[in-house]
Amino acid sequence: MLENAEIAAVVPVSDIDKACDFYGEKLGLKLDVRRDDLPQNQEAEFRAGDGTLVVYESVGAGKSRATVAGFRVADIDATVAELRSRGVAFEDYDMPDLKTENGIVTIGDLRAAWARDPDGNIIAIESRTG
């Protein structure tokens, strides 16, 4: 039923301007629509490939301890390097089942890195080698 539908990640943020700077300027997403005239909160939509990332102001911003959005890229090393040059900091993990090297973990054919937006929402960058 939904296999041909376009997917959208919806991310709560506390400050729409900071979110627009992070997702637009730092991550390089194209701002598609910004709504500052909504009665309860402001929101913005960014294009990412065939999908959409929506950020909206909410008191629930940054409360998830799990990944809220992920981006699949062809070359994770180049992407992480470019994002770092734009000021994005990547998480480092050193746990028995998850250890990053230069901010990137390799699990089978999956390579992934995680960063946080200004509210602490976790964003994943990933690529598959196989």
What are these regions (language model features)?
Residues 43, 52, 70, 112-113:
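Short hydrophobic/aromatic beta-strand element in the GNAT-like acyltransferase core
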Residues 18, 76-80:
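Short, conserved charged micro-motifs
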Residues 2, 71, 81-130:
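Vicinal oxygen chelate
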